[in-house]
């Protein structure tokens, strides 16, 4: 990058004034400053000066012009063939004659063509000028001690280069004139015509001459001296490792001792010899030891150690290689590019161009010493989890099947789009309890009927939707084989559901099936509660939005149902996706019990996986504690304690002193209950075994509540509403066929204990 040939004038003014220490050099500098204005005089001044020159005994062809800006100063144009010594003598005499009023300073410029004057007359003229300078100062410059009229000879040069040559030619002869402050004409100077003097080169650099002109005019001796001075003041733009390579590769055998490396660097980079601190040698030794490319070899006698470059790492970098000229289009050296980036000083850059004498684009570009790898982005594809596919015919244990189903449901739930949260009543969806006896209540409440309908209506409502829901169908099929292994006295509703789903998948119109409505086995209920708890924990941890769910009420849990009977199809979908059917309790909000007009549900629907209502046992309600522990005499129906033994209370509802809870009736009518009980008496395989739920895990939270003794019967669910007008009718319709025990008669029932409101 070339330096701009012109700088702001303020910088030039600050830079040029120098202290009066070396009179000859300073005078030459000052006269160099004055010289450029010699091309700006008017024709009138030129003719006037010519007349003066003719009158002052000057040889023919000499032109004397007043300086445009400097007072009492004249510019003398000397032809190539003129005698410089005689002209200097005439100018000295003229200065003495004029005294303080006339011009006492003369600037000599050559007015001929190419410079052909030998250097010897120039040196003689300069010496004569120096000898006469004191005379001029003492004799002719009495009133002006600061002004010195010193004519300085110049080698003849081309006429268009008069200003440039004058700035160099007067370098040897004059002292500084403090009164000369206007140097605006310096910006118009150029350095085309230059002499062979090193001082001229210094002046050119200080006056911001073009780099190409420097390369053309500067010769080897001055170039060496100037580059030495510039490099001393500026640190070389090479690393220690690069300079070590330059030194080692400069030898024929490509090896060098440590002392020779020091010497080579000092010779080629005087900065380290004159300016740098001695610690740079430590850096050289450090780099020799640090980089593996430098290998230390010992001579045969073991006294001398040489440093070489490993052949595999040696790129044979030399200092000459950096500046070696090549054909156009060849790459440039990285060292030179690095030097251009690192050094802001234009003088050092000028030094490089002086040494090369070639344009910047003709230098070699080499591979970087330390190649770098450009960074880039690597695209990464995240795998998508595929849903687990289960064969419906595979029989797996219940916990494993439940875990597989819960993981699959969790994955399916993540793919479902999140819908806005709305009330269930708006969409006609009702959360269904998972207890089989409770499912009987769906058509009753939805249609506003008394609990006197057969259970077949439930099956038709559940099966009739007939819609294929693939991810819901699989979990039901997986669960169905373990259900068939239970020797239950009557077919459970869950088995019925699974069979109906399989039938609906085969035929477009599902067949409603009739079956006895009975409770599942206690062990089955316990395992389902464990599975439900495990599934809830997993889905809560996998949900994208952690929601703080309101904990279910511990005293009187409430479940609400919609009046619309068309809500059972979506409700089944929610039930199958949220949890496995488990015994739950439905507690109406009012004291009226389940036989009153149903209340519209107000539970919000959340698209995120949420906890379902925890499982409850059908005998979670409370009566006044009985006085004895034996079998209940006040129960209208005697039930076998093995099949319908006590079940665990998952929510602590069995504790004493709790408010009596109103529950959904377990059966459509006492007659149907008694029929199922009679069937159970004949075919119950668990009648002689202890309650199987006691064998469940003791650490599960569902089993921490102490189990009830045998003083609770499932028929405690027949808590009737005393405010209902149909109470007497329902009680009168109760008959007990097939049971001949006396305590089962309605006359022996203690209704004050059975219904607390009668007290």
From Swiss-Prot:
Function noted in UniProt: Transcription factor regulating the expression of cell cycle genes essential for DNA replication and mitosis. Plays a role in the control of cell proliferation. Also plays a role in DNA break repair, participating in the DNA damage checkpoint response. Promotes transcription of PHB2.
Cellular localization per UniProt: Nucleus
Biased composition (Basic and acidic residues): 335-349, 531-542
Record PTM: Phosphorylated in M (mitotic) phase. Phosphorylation by the checkpoint kinase CHEK2 in response to DNA damage increases the FOXM1 protein stability probably stimulating the transcription of genes involved in DNA repair. Phosphorylated by CDK1 in late S and G2 phases, creating docking sites for the POLO box domains of PLK1. Subsequently, PLK1 binds and phosphorylates FOXM1, leading to activation of transcriptional activity and subsequent enhanced expression of key mitotic regulators. Phosphorylated by GSK3B leading to ubiquitination and proteasomal degradation.
Induction note: Activated in S phase.
Principal localisation: nucleus
Residue positions, PTM Phosphoserine: 330, 375, 521, 726, 735
Organism the protein comes from: Rattus norvegicus (Rat)
GO CC field: nucleus
Compositionally biased intervals (Low complexity): 141-151
Nucleus among keywords: yes
Superkingdom in the source lineage: Eukaryota
InterPro entries linked to this entry: FH_FOXM1, Fork_head_dom, FOXM1, TF_fork_head_CS_1, TF_fork_head_CS_2, WH-like_DNA-bd_sf, WH_DNA-bd_sf
Name of protein: Forkhead box protein M1
